């Protein structure tokens, strides 16, 4: 089961918008996640410590996570996951394929 967490042990229910970019040689890439009104803001079981992508292969994580506030209230979370080589890229894609299938999501290639 593929899941996303901001607080370890607390699954995020909001489905993110994910944008991927990759270097021309495929050696590295970045995934940017945007969560509008994530459910983690409704949970008071600790602080957000990172973005954790968890599946049967293990865990991918990043500490590059930012919350956006409007009028003093949390509204969204943005996170970036950097992939430094082809193996990390392929591992991330496997996670996203599982997460997408589980949540009935699709992948759309950007138009040039």
From Swiss-Prot:
Keywords: Cyanelle, Membrane, Photosynthesis, Photosystem II, Plastid, Thylakoid
Pfam families named in the record: Psb28 (PF03912)
Signal peptide location: none
Subcellular location: Plastid, Cyanelle thylakoid membrane
Disulfide bond sites: none
One record GO biological process: photosynthesis
Gene3D superfamilies: Photosystem II Psb28 (2.40.30.220)
Topology of this chain in the membrane: Peripheral membrane protein
Domain of life: Eukaryota
Family: Belongs to the Psb28 family.
Subunit organization: Part of the photosystem II complex.
Annotated protein name in UniProt: Photosystem II reaction center Psb28 protein
Organism field: Cyanophora paradoxa
Gene that specifies this protein: psb28
């Amino acid at each position: 089961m593929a899941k996303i967490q901001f607080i370890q042990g607390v699954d995020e229910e909001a489905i993110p918008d994910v944008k991927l970019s990759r270097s021309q040689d495929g050696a590295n890439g970045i995934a940017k996640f945007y969560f509008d009104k994530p459910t983690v803001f409704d949970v008071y079981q600790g602080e957000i410590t990172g973005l954790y992508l968890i599946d049967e292969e293990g865990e991918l994580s990043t500490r590059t996570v930012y919350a956006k506030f409007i009028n003093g209230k949390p509204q969204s979370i943005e996170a970036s996951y950097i992939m430094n080589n082809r193996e990390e890229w392929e591992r991330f894609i496997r996670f996203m394929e599982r997460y997408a299938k589980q949540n009935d999501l699709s992948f759309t290639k950007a138009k040039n």
